[in-house]
Design a protein with these regions (language model features):
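Conserved active-site alpha-helix within GNAT-family acetyltransferase domains
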Residues: 118-122, 127-151
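Conserved GNAT-family N-acetyltransferase fold
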Residues: 60, 71-73, 88, 93, ...
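Active-site rim helix/loop that mediates acceptor-substrate recognition in acyltransferases
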Residues: 26, 33-65, 69-79
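A short beta-loop-alpha structural element at the N-terminal edge
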Residues: 12-25
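Conserved acetyl-CoA-binding loop-helix of GNAT-fold acetyltransferases
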Residues: 90, 95, 101-114, 126
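C-terminal "cap" of GNAT-fold acetyltransferases
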Residues: 125, 146-177
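Conserved glycine-rich acetyl-CoA-binding loop
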Residues: 68, 96-107, 119, 135-136
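A conserved beta-turn-beta hairpin within the catalytic core of GNAT-like acetyltransferases
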Residues: 78-90, 100
């Protein structure tokens, strides 16, 4: 069995999604979210729909030294007050169940945020656990909202310029089939 060594030793290789990775990403995402009580099981479909719409600004994979795909993260454009800009949404992020809580997701997130900075992105938003995402600098702000969701879970990270204000909307792929 191929595994990623524990934190502190060899890290996964993070690189852009390659042609032909879509099926593996879909299978990985389905497996990663299957045991999650908050999941509606739609995450793989969202990634496929973003890819088909040309809306995957960044699609990164984590690979073991042997080349096994064990993680994926997607970033796509978001709109603030229905205006396009340089803000992006993080997610979904998926890690093979046997490798969760071993730093693969953190490596994907950190690399993805660095790549957004390279693209001169203004910021990034997500809907997720504030206790987890705080380590990457994500914060909640009542001036930035998402479809009436609890503000505690809708978070942002400013990469340049002032914080965004208004109501954020993700790509329509997140709205369902």
């Amino acid at each position: 069995m191929n595994t990623i060594p524990p934190q502190g030793s060899e890290s996964p290789r993070i690189e852009p999604e390659r042609p032909g990775d879509a099926r593996e990403i879909s299978q990985l995402t389905t497996a990663a979210f299957a045991p999650m009580p908050f999941s509606d099981g739609d995450e793989a479909r969202v990634i496929d729909a973003l890819r088909e719409a040309g809306a995957l600004t960044l699609s990164l994979v984590a690979l073991t030294a042997e080349g096994e795909l064990v993680g994926h993260i997607a970033f796509s454009p978001v709109r603030i007050d229905d205006q396009p800009g340089d803000w992006y949404g993080l997610g979904p992020v998926s890690v093979a169940p046997r490798l969760q809580r071993q730093g693969v997701g953190s490596a994907l997130i950190a690399t993805g945020l660095d790549r957004l900075r390279d693209l001169s992105a203004a910021g990034c938003v997500l809907l997720g656990n504030p206790d987890y995402y705080r380590r990457f600098g994500f914060l909640s702000d009542p001036a930035l909202t998402y479809q009436g969701r609890p503000n505690r879970y809708f978070q942002h990270l400013v990469l340049k310029g002032p914080p965004a204000q208004g109501d954020a909307s993700f790509h329509p792929a997140f709205d369902g089939p």
